[in-house]
Amino acid sequence: MHRLKQASNIQAASGRGRHRVYAIAQLLGDDLLLSIWGGALPHIGSVSITQPRASGQAPERLSTTSSVYNFYGHKDESVARLCAERIAAACNKKTVAVAGIH
């Protein structure tokens, strides 16, 4: 049996009461998994899969390419996409963000 290397976690929270939002970022080797949830009914509403790449206009700068999946009726894309793209570009890591806030 292979021994698993423990992943590193970073946790954060912001807001109060029903407006409180939580996030956990977990390093998985060279990649990053981000979970964002909060409100009265935490859930999985949208998933953003983001990869850093050289910008087409300024190759010395990092940009990103994303694919997003939204579960029917959910509008969490803006949170998942924004967080994944900013983190992927800043950290130069493939990033998957899962978001669900009600």
Please describe what each predicted stretch is.
Residues 1-11:
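Extended amphipathic alpha-helical scaffolds
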Residues 10-102:
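Conserved mixed alpha/beta catalytic, RNA-binding, or beta-rich assembly cores of soluble enzyme
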